[in-house]
Amino acid sequence: DSTTFLNSFYPSANDYHSLHEIDNFSWFNGGRNLFEETPLKINESKVFTLKNKTKASTGILTVAVTTGDYKSTIKVEANGRELGEIHIAPGDSFDKGYEIIRDYAVSNLQSVDSIRLTTISGGPTRLDYLAMTYPTPAPAPSLNTSFPTPEYVYNITNQDHHADDPVNMVIIIPTSQKLLQQAERLADFHRTHDNITVRIVPADELYNEFSSGTPDAMAYRRYMKMLYDRTTNAQTMPQSLLLFGDCVWDNRMNTNSCRLLNPDDYLLAYESENSFS
């Protein structure tokens, strides 16, 4: 029934938090940890708001701020009350960006809390995220209201890569398949000159079957692991994986340098969390 269904997921971790995070800037062209593009120059401030759905009067405010390769100080205020200052002192001359995360105990919370950040030295600085953690959860969602409807993106053709037999070489091409003809040329070369089996797979077909439709590099790995586990002899053992096409560090295409690119023309790259500097 509806009560059992609700109890299966409520309350969850998200019900105890309010978050402000915009990912559209990077200090360095690398990493998967992005920041908010709006710069706060010296003596400039910006007010951010966090909705308090829990109606709690106390909470823990987490502030994550970043700066370039220079010292900066950011003043933090909540609902007009100063909480403290965050000092960022770069240490490695090779790094392009630095981040400091601080927690503050906050009282007298409102239905909408205002967080003001002011750069009082150095700068410009940029926000990574603001998060408020509450001691009580937000009210349970009403199951009588309307729910979002799925968005139609495109028709998926019939496919069943879970039925694929092992091959010696897998070539993954971008979703747009603009490189299909060249990939076929390379595959034919290996079949003829190396006497190996080769399969060409568009990236989106792997996402649809191995990562629930979400562009995720783990789909590449899961597909190859399936072929490896399915192998029964050395002749059919997967030997090579070729990512045939360009990768780009900003897989979500959120930053200015990547925003105008077509994701379907690129394969996914792995970027670590701390590679932003």
List the predicted regions and their residue ranges:
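Structured catalytic cores of large enzymes
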Residues: D1-Q177, Q181-Q182, D188-H193, E209-S277
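Short, well-structured beta-strand/strand-turn elements
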Residues: D194-Y207
